[in-house]
């Protein structure tokens, strides 16, 4: 069992048979060692009690009811009297029943079994370490081939080398005539190895440091060969693939050395049995039992393993082919338990439903890790859909009233009592239920000094969870500034976010100093800005500044305008005859827009200050309009200049839209605010 106070992380990897035995084995007070599951039974059909040495045995996994053994005797847990701590009749310890959530058992396999994750998953770790094709290793594991066992400093009678098919050997029927049955088995086992045992022998003989050195030497030789012979493209690709394989092989060997994992641990001799509470049998209405699929897969393994034990021990005259066939069945049963369907057709029950194996239980969105460990429900948390909050600051978020009053209810009750708005907790809760006006005022004060954390799954990097200062908003959706969406990889098409309230002072300080959104503007991976306009903001800016498609030359022949005007609406034809209005300042233009005298994208002329005008002296006017008083207008593509008789500039008008004005004013206010903040800092 993992101590939650001592261990804050979890590492998954291969373990030795000794470690599996240490997890599952326990010594009873009378000195008896228990832990091995030898029977494929669960509960007795008459007594409804767990079978001894079965998958739910109370001697191995602990009592079903705290302090009560199989016989029905009772002892107080934690009692310091000299009474025995276990039942001498049934051998069950008087301990808490919660032990059945973490106490494991084991199955002692009659033959070594290859772990299918390391053999069949890509890349195959066993094939990479042994530098052999995966098909050859599969044929060896599933007894399609046999392997000649090298006998050091001893002559071999059959003179076999490498892999061979046992079925087609000429000596298969002739040599047994000269041996007794037991003698031939000893002779055959001396020179022939098959199944996962052959894989294990090769992994035991493997020296990882020699693997690294030999792979490095071959990698260098291939590099020199590729530099000298670079004419054949096919050979270059072949050499490149081999070099990539050697790099993966060296990295894998270094990983095994660094983590102190032995390669032979990828072949199982002991099979762990999960605690019973993780694979329960539940009785439903009508007396029917519902069992976890893992129990049926365990039973299949135990049945086949016990059959193999009988063939190896009780029957001395068992043919070798029958033993190899039974070893293959044990291997397939363990494969189904670990990963059902990895070798093709999955195993199904009587209702044609596929059994759920270990892989199905732990992987995916509904697996043990993502649903139970990473996605478990916690207190002081909520969840809702996100919507855009265009008026929010970067470090703020809008929290719905309904969610806020639940998350901050504890703090709200304390503030109501402290400020004498409520005499006790009951009165405070009644005020909160009635949603009196004073409640919202106190809630705003509480939230003002308390940050919250927003998280969007999957949390693939540290910007997947950020801190914000909450403010109350109407509705039921979380309002979010659009600039922070890239860090969350979120958009406003129905995405949901989780809300967490940091409780301790340390958590609140960490949220304020390290996790606020306005302090996380750069990507932690590459250092590029991550708070940049995306999606909704880009579309909004485009619509804001797009304007009318017709330019100032709309009344003249222009090829681009002629192409764009094919699908113009009737209102655009009316626009050609309508004169564009003039405004002396932006306030008048915005007032006309609010009075619906002009449209959002309708162009107009806006008087501009001379000190803010930048004109190109080489640009020629498109048209020149002369007035009766001698003044004239130089009309350019985007601005208009009114000059006097002496050619002096009287005033300047720019051709713009309401969207451009709004965008310019926002940028101007932002720059002025930045300059003021910078001057205050100096």
Swiss-Prot record:
- Say which domain of life the source belongs to: Eukaryota
Q: Which GO terms describe its molecular function?
A: DNA binding; DNA-directed RNA polymerase activity; magnesium ion binding; zinc ion binding
InterPro entries from the UniProt entry: DNA-dir_RpoC_beta_prime, RNA_pol_asu, RNA_pol_N, RNA_pol_Rpb1_1, RNA_pol_Rpb1_3_sf, RNA_pol_Rpb1_clamp_domain, RNApol_RpoC1
Could you say which residues bind Zn(2+) here? 69, 71, 87, 90
Q: Which cofactor does it need?
A: Mg(2+); Zn(2+)
* Location relative to the cell: Plastid, Chloroplast
Recorded catalytic activity of this chain's protein: RNA(n) + a ribonucleoside 5'-triphosphate = RNA(n+1) + diphosphate
Annotated GO biological process: DNA-templated transcription
Q: Name one GO cellular component term.
A: mitochondrion
Is Metal-binding set as a keyword in this record?
Answer: yes
- On whether Chloroplast is a keyword of this UniProt record, the answer is yes
Cofactor binding comment, as recorded: Binds 1 Mg(2+) ion per subunit.
Known EC number(s)?
2.7.7.6
Query: Can you tell me which residues bind Mg(2+)?
Result: 491, 493, 495
What SMART domains does the annotation carry?
A: RPOLA_N (SM00663)
Q: What family, per the record?
A: Belongs to the RNA polymerase beta' chain family. RpoC1 subfamily.
Quaternary context: In plastids the minimal PEP RNA polymerase catalytic core is composed of four subunits: alpha, beta, beta', and beta''. When a (nuclear-encoded) sigma factor is associated with the core the holoenzyme is formed, which can initiate transcription.
**Entry function:** DNA-dependent RNA polymerase catalyzes the transcription of DNA into RNA using the four ribonucleoside triphosphates as substrates.
Name of the featured protein: DNA-directed RNA polymerase subunit beta'
| Species assigned in the record | Lotus japonicus
């Amino acid at each position: 069992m993992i101590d939650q106070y001592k261990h804050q992380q979890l590492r998954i990897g291969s373990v030795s048979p000794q470690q599996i035995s240490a997890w599952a084995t326990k010594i009873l007070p009378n000195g008896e060692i228990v832990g091995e599951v030898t029977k494929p039974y669960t509960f007795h059909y008459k007594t409804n009690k767990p079978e001894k040495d079965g998958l739910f045995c109370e001697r191995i996994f602990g009592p079903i009811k705290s302090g009560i053994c199989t016989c029905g005797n009772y002892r107080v847990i934690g009692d310091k009297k000299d009474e025995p701590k276990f039942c001498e009749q049934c051998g069950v310890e008087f301990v808490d029943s919660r032990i059945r959530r973490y106490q494991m058992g084991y199955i002692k396999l009659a033959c070594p079994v290859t772990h299918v994750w390391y053999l069949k998953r890509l890349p195959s770790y066993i094939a990479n370490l042994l530098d052999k094709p995966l098909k050859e290793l599969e044929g060896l594991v599933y007894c399609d081939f046999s392997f000649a066992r090298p006998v050091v400093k001893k002559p071999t009678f059959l003179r076999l080398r490498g892999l061979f098919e046992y079925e087609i050997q000429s000596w298969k029927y002739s040599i047994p005539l000269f041996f007794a049955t037991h003698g031939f088995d000893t002779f055959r086992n001396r020179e022939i190895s098959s199944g996962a045992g052959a894989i294990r022998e090769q992994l035991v003989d493997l020296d990882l440091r020699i693997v690294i050195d030999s792979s490095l030497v071959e990698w260098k030789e291939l590099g020199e060969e590729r530099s000298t012979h670079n004419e054949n493209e096919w050979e270059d690709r072949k050499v490149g693939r081999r070099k990539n394989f050697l790099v993966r092989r060296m990295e894998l060997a270094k990983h095994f050395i660094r983590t102190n994992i032995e390669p032979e641990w990828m072949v199982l001799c002991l099979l762990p049995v999960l605690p019973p509470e993780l694979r329960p049998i539940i009785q439903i209405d009508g007396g029917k039992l519902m069992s976890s699929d893992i129990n049926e897969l365990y039973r299949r393994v135990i049945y086949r393993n016990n059959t193999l034990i009988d063939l190896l021990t009780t029957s001395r005259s068992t043919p070798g082919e029958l033993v190899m066939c039974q070893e293959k069945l044990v291997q397939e049963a363990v494969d189904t338990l670990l990963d059902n369907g990895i070798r093709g057709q999955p195993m199904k029950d009587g209702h044609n439903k596929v059994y759920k194996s270990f892989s199905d239980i732990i992987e995916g969105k509904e697996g043990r890790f993502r649903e139970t460990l990473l996605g478990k429900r916690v207190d002081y948390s909520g969840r809702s859909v996100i919507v855009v909050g265009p008026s929010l600051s970067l470090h703020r978020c809008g929290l719905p009233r309904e969610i806020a009053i639940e998350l901050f209810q504890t703090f709200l009750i304390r503030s109501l009592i402290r400020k004498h708005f409520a005499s006790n907790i009951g009165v405070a809760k009644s005020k909160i239920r009635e949603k009196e006006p004073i409640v919202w005022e106190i809630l705003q004060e509480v939230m003002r000094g308390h940050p919250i954390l927003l998280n969007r799954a999957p949390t693939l990097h540290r910007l997947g969870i950020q801190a914000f200062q909450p403010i109350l908003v109407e509705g039921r959706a979380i309002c979010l500034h659009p600039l922070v969406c890239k860090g969350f990889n979120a958009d406003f098409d129905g995405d949901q976010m989780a809300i967490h309230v940091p409780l301790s002072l340390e958590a609140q300080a960490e949220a304020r100093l390290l996790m606020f959104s306005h302090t996380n503007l750069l990507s932690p991976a590459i250092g590029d800005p991550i708070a940049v306009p995306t999606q909704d903001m880009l579309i909004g800016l485009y619509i804001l500044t797009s304007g009318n498609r017709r330019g100032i030359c709309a009344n003249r022949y222009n090829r681009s305008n002629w192409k764009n005007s094919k699908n113009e609406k009737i209102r655009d034809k009316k626009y050609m005859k309508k004169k564009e209005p003039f405004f002396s300042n932006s306030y008048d233009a915005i007032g006309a827009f609010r009075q619906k005298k002009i449209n959002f994208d309708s162009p107009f002329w806006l008087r501009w200050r001379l000190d803010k005008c930048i004109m190109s002296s080489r640009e020629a006017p498109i048209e020149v309009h002369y007035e009766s008083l001698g003044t004239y207008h130089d009309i350019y593509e985007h601005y208009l200049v009114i000059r006097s008789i002496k050619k002096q500039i009287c005033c300047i008008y720019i051709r713009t839209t309401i969207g451009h004005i709004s965008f310019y004013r926002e940028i101007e206010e932002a720059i002025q605010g930045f300059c003021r903040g910078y001057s205050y800092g100096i």
